[in-house]
Amino acid sequence: TMLSGDIPKNKSVWYQKHMAHHIFDHSNLEWTKDVVNCFLIRNPKEVINSYIKRFNLTNALQLGYKQQLRIFNFLKNSTGQTPVVLNAKDVLMNPKSQLQGLCAKLGIEFTVDMLSWPSGKRDTDGVWAPHWYSEVEKTTGFQPYSYSNTTLEDKWSEIYKKCLSDYDLLNSFRMKP
């Protein structure tokens, strides 16, 4: 298939970013067994505060935690293997160690070149670039973890609670720093 066929352009790695909120309850997940999966998670409080700056948030499904956990459990139960889980905070607090660990788990050679990149837009950024990547486009490497908005307005508490239990479960499987 287009998602799990031959790797394009004779590359050794074919990275695909999938957004879990696009996976519906009726979606067939069998194709996920044909690729190596890695789950990148982030604290729901941080996600909510970021998301509401750009989009109207009406329910927890928009953030994808339930769907991410569904995919994770499907893979764990159907393959007998625990998929790799990375916490974004851990990556930002120690990018080299986290990327070395990720590469080791995925069978990819780590190089220090993975820790930096040229600033600017990329052909591979896709349709979401204008919505999410403006800050990333200014960077040349991982920025130190910084989260100053530790509060969450009360109106988001229900959505936060719905996401938190799924996040906590996924986080319990994260690759430790």
Show where each model-derived region lies:
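Active-site donor-binding segments of glycosyltransferases and PAPS-dependent sulfotransferases
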Residues: 1-13
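PAPS-dependent sulfotransferases, especially Golgi type II membrane carbohydrate sulfotransferases
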Residues: 109-177
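PAPS-dependent sulfotransferase catalytic domain
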Residues: 19-113, 127-134, 138
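Membrane-anchoring alpha-helices and their flanking helix-loop junctions
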Residues: 13-19
